[in-house]
Amino acid sequence: MADRRYCCLHDFLSRTDEGREWEDILPVRKWLYQTPEQILIKASNGASDFGNKFGQPLICGSVLTFEHTENNEVYGYDKVIMLAGGVGYGTQRDCLKGTPEAGNKVVVIGGDNYRIGLGGGSVSSVDTGRYSSGIELNAVQRANAEMQKRANNVVRALCEEDVNPVVSIHDHGSAGHVNCLSELVEECGGLIDMSKLPIGDKTLSAKEIIANESQERMGLLIKEEAIEHVRKIAERERAPMYVVGETTGDHRFSFQQADGVRPFDLAVEQMFGSSPKTYMIDKTVERHYEMPEYELPKLHEYLTNVL
């Protein structure tokens, strides 16, 4: 079941009618690229279009708006939030990842690399406009519903087999290959052959190849003896499949070019185990707000305002 949910300020409203006090809690602010109204309309259209192309139409959703000011404090969803996803099921057998061994093959299923979706993890976590427009627009992701459906069909076919040949699996999200594939080899290390990665744009730098985000790709760790079997399933589903590396057992994660140069070469513990710890000290602050004033005879008026 696919759905979408939105959280935003009242700014998504058109404000074509004057004198509606409940829309004027906060002053209308200026927006950098798109207004909340434009985002909700375009995101909704895009989500519905993607679901239809994928073959899983959106059948539910919601919109939540909130803004409040009191005691010189302002609360609200200042940044429009869109949550898109789905609800499915899996077997208990497949709920935990397996343990990788040296020699397991690193496989990528899905589309090519392009100069898009760079820095998405960083940009999505800060105020819009903090970085230059070039950085922010480069971070915009892409998704190809047809390609994602093909990759999904391969994964589903493997899950429905009596013996699932997948040792580990991870989707491509922020940071692209460097994030996805490192998750597969976290316990033992791995070497990725960059010449085996599918390149849609020959002008990409090593950083762009390693870190671009394309959400219709999946990373899998497959036992060597099962590679040809998985390849036949991928061919049946017309899903591009690439064997791009293998686990090494040396506890390093590296990307190596055809000339032997490694633009990315780190110990696994540097990526997962030695990051500075962040300590957050919680302090409970009790706040008291005035009860809203209302008159029961005006119930229908209030409903009309909201609807």
Task: Provide a role label for each language-model segment.
Residues 1-307:
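Glycine/proline-enriched, intrinsically flexible loops and inter-domain linkers
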